[in-house]
């Protein structure tokens, strides 16, 4: 694999613009090579022209012209000249190579003069238009070579400037990310140590109770625990490390000592209690996405554990960023040496070794610190288990048996499906479900439809993962996957092939046995299919990708609790998938009713109640998405989410209107036609609304000012026709509801085939929609250079909100009392400075000074001083006496202790020992 493809495959996609522009350097080196070749060709052509011109005289007078060294003729003397167009000799490209320039008196010389080159074949001097003739040693005589030399120097400077720009870019980005990751680690470390201190004897209690028990140890800092009113989102551009200072790169040992001092056992200032106090003090500045008001200690511990694992993955990615850039620079210098046949790679790599992103050893220190803290805190000192959990596994390559089983199961499934279609066409009234042969065929059809549509979506999702992994789309960030336990497209396709084989086997056995055997035995196989699928989804054992299954269950649990939890991308992304599977809920209700009632009574109760329950169940997925939009509007206060709410409201209205139009509630044909017309109008409006949202919001296309016609500026897929094709097909598949109008004359049971067709079309449309939705989200993250999603949980408040409000009221009352007391003291001090008649004390020298002026030894000439309420004039001498007297009284009242000077000591010279004086 070439390094360019290797770099594109291994790089963090969100940091793509921050890597070395390897292709640009390759192009620059190729241009240098091309310039060198053209320069050699120019020298060869010049010598050939010289030979031809000296061999063939132009006229007889040329032989009579003496050489330049022997000629004494003036510049105005007539000379024989030949004019040749410039484009036949002058090069057209700029180069960075050097050329030797030497010319003899008998050689032919060229010069650039207003798009023409004049060649003097005899005299050696060149005469150009609008210029005086110059001697052979003139710089114009060597003009073409010097022009090439200047072009070579310019290209070399361009290469050097590109190199310096890349150094600056890589160093700046590396330093920024390094500071951010170190800041995150310090925050996590403080909270881990604080939690270890708090949770020693309270592992089974809530964090609120544990903190209330440990509040005597925390002292006055207990009120600094989590408070939602002071939470701020940290600005990543201003992140600084509190444990590691930017003192250059040299001195990894000093960094190690600095981190050794920050460990709990290194100094008294870093003891567990001190770390707890620091964690509490910095809790308000941590980045959080949820309110952990009811979290248990164990959940907080797991959150910190995941945060530390994510921080470790960030550091590993930044280290790989360094190594890839080093390899890129080495490849560039080697290619430069190969093309120019030089030996500059050694000096170039020395220059690379001096860069900050190579010399910095802070990440190594942090990496060891994380490993040690994680091992001792979460793995009880077992380093092997800790490293197995911290390290991200390498890229998964499916073993041959997995690929073989996937292909084998897919092939057998296809064969079984063909046999099923053959049996149903020959023996089953597949178009008219009212036929009694085979028994309960309609119920089994709906059962297999309920399972088959999600299996089809699973196949589509595996293909989606295959394409996105090849395009290096960061699904770990977008969907919130764990990089250590995630499944790849190999696993998804293998699971889909296995489920497809079970599905076709169940359908084949039921169809074959139902034709040849009477009774309920054939229904056993569809029932076993349901049992196997439920076991695979909810299996509690650590088999069949349990972390991924639990992640999916957790995601759908968040979807169903939409109004009560903040909405993440994975929530509304899989909520959209769920809207395409709305028919599955209706089939699920029918299947449950069948196994509970109709299977044993041979009745059709389920079919009679299905038209009334079906619209309610079909409206559940869009209702959940509408509630998610309301929650996002509540959190963000953006009106765009209310527009999304309107889209799903129209979808629900269209579903309800369609159910009413097709139900038996309307006996009058005119009312039924009117309801049908209303449904068509609502469906058209809903389709246009949804298409506009798909193109403008979800895909980000239809930009009128884009450089790509009706698309957007940045496209992730290479071929533009893919976007236009997707826009057309998405429009057509959005209108799949019109099929129901075309087959309105069919019976309600026969329409179940139409429902199957529309469901397959909708799932296919969603499959296509997913590509461009994930692309748009990925480009948004790339624009923000966001590659990781690290969430640090905050510590809870020890008091309820009512107690907090009471505390705030008490603090406000205390502040008001202190202000009133200060005002009274100021009035007392002002009255003391007034005479018996209420006039200010006046001396010979009037000067306005303040306490600061007195301390600094400065004063202002006559004026006034505003002491909040008292405004007066005073004598400087009397003021000095008052201050000295006040200082003496303060010393006596405080047992000769040194008391700092304050303005209150001046105002309260008779009350210096009072409790309210601010000494």
From Swiss-Prot:
It is a multi-pass membrane protein. The record marks 22, 26 as: Important for inositol polyphosphate binding. Residues 70-132, 252-272 have a biased composition (Low complexity). Its main location: membrane. One of its GO terms (biological process) is cellular response to phosphate starvation. It is found in: Membrane. Keywords: Membrane, Transmembrane, Transmembrane helix. Residues 605-806 form the EXS domain. One of its GO terms (molecular function) is phosphate transmembrane transporter activity. Residues 62-137, 242-272, 891-919 are annotated as: Disordered. It holds the Pfam family SPX. Residues 331-338 are annotated as: Important for inositol polyphosphate binding. Residues 898-910 have a biased composition (Polar residues). CDD domains: SPX. The chain crosses the membrane at residues 401-421, 450-470, 492-512, 521-541, 676-696. Residues 1-350 form the SPX domain. GO terms for cellular component: plasma membrane. Belongs to the SYG1 (TC 2.A.94) family. The SPX domain has high affinity for inositol polyphosphates, such as myo-inositol hexakisphosphate and 5-diphospho-myo-inositol pentakisphosphate (5-InsP7). Its affinity for inorganic phosphate is tow to three orders of magnitude lower. May play a role in phosphate homeostasis. Binds inositol hexakisphosphate (Ins6P) and similar inositol polyphosphates, such as 5-diphospho-inositol pentakisphosphate (5-InsP7); these are important intracellular signaling molecules. This is SPX and EXS domain-containing protein 3. It comes from Dictyostelium discoideum. The gene is xpr1.
């Amino acid at each position: 694999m070439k390094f360019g493809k290797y770099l594109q495959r291994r790089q963090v996609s969100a940091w793509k613009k921050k890597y070395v522009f390897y292709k640009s350097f390759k192009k620059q080196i190729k241009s240098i090579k091309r310039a060198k070749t053209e320069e050699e060709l120019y020298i060869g052509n010049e010598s050939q022209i010289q030979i031809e011109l000296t061999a063939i005289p132009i006229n007889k007078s040329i032989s009579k012209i003496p050489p330049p060294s022997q000629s004494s003729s003036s510049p105005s003397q007539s000379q024989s000249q030949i004019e040749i167009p410039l484009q036949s000799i002058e090069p057209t490209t700029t180069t960075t190579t050097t050329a030797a320039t030497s010319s003899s008196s008998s050689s032919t010389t060229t010069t650039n003069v207003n798009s023409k080159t004049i060649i003097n074949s005899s005299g050696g001097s060149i005469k150009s238009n609008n210029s005086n003739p110059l001697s052979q040693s003139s710089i114009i005589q060597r003009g073409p070579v010097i022009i090439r030399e200047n072009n070579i120097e310019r290209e070399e400077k361009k290469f050097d400037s590109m190199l310096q720009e890349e150094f600056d870019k890589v160093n700046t980005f590396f330093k920024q990310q390094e500071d951010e990751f170190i800041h995150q680690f310090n925050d996590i470390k403080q909270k881990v140590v604080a939690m270890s201190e708090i949770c020693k004897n309270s592992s089974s209690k809530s964090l609120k109770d544990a903190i209330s028990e440990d509040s005597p140890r925390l002292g006055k800092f207990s009120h600094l625990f989590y408070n939602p009113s002071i939470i701020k989102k940290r600005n990543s551009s201003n992140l600084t490390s509190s444990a590691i200072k930017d003192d250059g790169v040299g001195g990894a040992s000093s960094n190690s000592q600095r981190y050794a001092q920050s460990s709990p056992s290194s100094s008294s200032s870093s003891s567990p209690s001190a770390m707890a106090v620091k964690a509490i003090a910095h809790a308000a500045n941590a980045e959080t996405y949820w309110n952990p008001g009811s979290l248990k200690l164990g959940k907080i511990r797991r959150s910190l554990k995941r945060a530390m694992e994510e921080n470790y993955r960030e550091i590993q990615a930044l280290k790989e960023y360094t190594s890839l850039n080093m390899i890129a620079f080495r490849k560039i210098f080697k290619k430069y040496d190969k093309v120019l046949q030089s030996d500059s790679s050694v000096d170039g790599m020395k220059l690379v070794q001096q860069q900050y992103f190579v010399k910095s050893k802070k990440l190594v220190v942090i990496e060891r610190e994380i490993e040690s803290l994680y091992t001792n805190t979460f793995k009880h000192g077992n380093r092997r288990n800790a490293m197995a959990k911290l390290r991200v596994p390498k890229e998964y390559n499916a073993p041959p048996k997995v690929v073989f089983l996937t292909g084998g199961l897919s092939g057998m499934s296809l064969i079984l499906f063909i046999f099923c279609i053959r049996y149903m066409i020959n023996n089953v009234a597949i178009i008219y479900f009212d036929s009694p042969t085979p028994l309960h065929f309609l119920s089994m059809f709906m059962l297999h439809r309920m399972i088959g549509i999600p299996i089809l979506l699973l196949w589509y999702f595996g293909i989606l993962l295959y394409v996105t992994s090849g395009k290096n789309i960061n699904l770990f960030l977008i969907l919130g996957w764990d990089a250590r336990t995630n499944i790849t497209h190999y696993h998804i396709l293998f699971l889909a092939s296995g489920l497809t084989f079970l599905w076709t086997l169940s359908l084949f056995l039921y169809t074959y046995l139902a034709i040849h055997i009477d009774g309920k035995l054939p229904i056993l196989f569809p029932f076993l299919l349901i049992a196997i699928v439920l076991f695979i989804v909810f299996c509690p054992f650590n088999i069949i990708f349990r972390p991924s299954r639990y992640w999916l269950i957790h995601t759908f649990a968040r979807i169903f609790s939409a109004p009560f939890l903040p909405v993440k991308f994975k929530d509304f992304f899989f909520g959209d998938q769920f809207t395409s599977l709305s028919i599955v809920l209706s089939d699920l209700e029918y299947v449950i009713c069948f196994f509970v009632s109709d299977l044993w009574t041979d009745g059709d109760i389920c079919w009679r109640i299905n038209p009334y329950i079906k619209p309610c169940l079909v409206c559940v997925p869009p209702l959940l998405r509408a509630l998610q939009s309301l929650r996002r509007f509540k959190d963000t206060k953006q009106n765009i989410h209310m527009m999304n709410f309107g889209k799903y409201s129209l979808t629900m209205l269209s579903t309800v209107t369609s159910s009413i139009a097709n139900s038996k509630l309307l006996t009058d044909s005119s009312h039924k036609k009117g309801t049908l017309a209303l449904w068509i109008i609502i469906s058209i409006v809903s389709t246009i609304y949804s298409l506009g949202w798909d193109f403008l919001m979800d895909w980000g296309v239809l930009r009128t000012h884009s450089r790509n016609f009706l698309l957007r500026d940045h496209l992730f897929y290479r071929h533009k026709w893919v976007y236009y094709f997707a826009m057309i097909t998405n429009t057509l598949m959005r209108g799949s509801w019109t099929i129901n109008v075309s087959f309105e004359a069919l019976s309600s049971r026969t329409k179940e085939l139409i429902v199957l067709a529309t469901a397959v079309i909708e799932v296919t449309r969603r499959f296509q929609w997913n590509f461009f939705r994930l692309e748009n989200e990925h480009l948004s993250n790339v624009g923000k250079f966001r590659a990781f999603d690290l969430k640090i949980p905050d510590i809870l408040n020890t008091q309820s909100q009512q107690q907090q409000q009471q505390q705030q009221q008490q603090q406000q009352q205390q502040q008001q009392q202190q202000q009133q007391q200060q005002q009274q003291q100021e009035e007392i001090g002002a009255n003391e400075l007034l005479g018996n008649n209420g006039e200010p004390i006046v001396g010979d020298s009037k000067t306005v000074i303040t306490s600061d002026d007195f301390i600094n030894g400065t004063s202002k000439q006559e004026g006034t001083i505003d002491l909040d309420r008292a405004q007066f004039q005073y004598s400087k001498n009397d003021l000095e006496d008052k201050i000295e007297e006040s200082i003496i009284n303060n010393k006596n009242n405080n047992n000769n202790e040194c008391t700092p000077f304050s303005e209150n000591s001046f105002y309260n010279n008779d009350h210096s020992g009072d409790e309210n004086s601010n000494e």
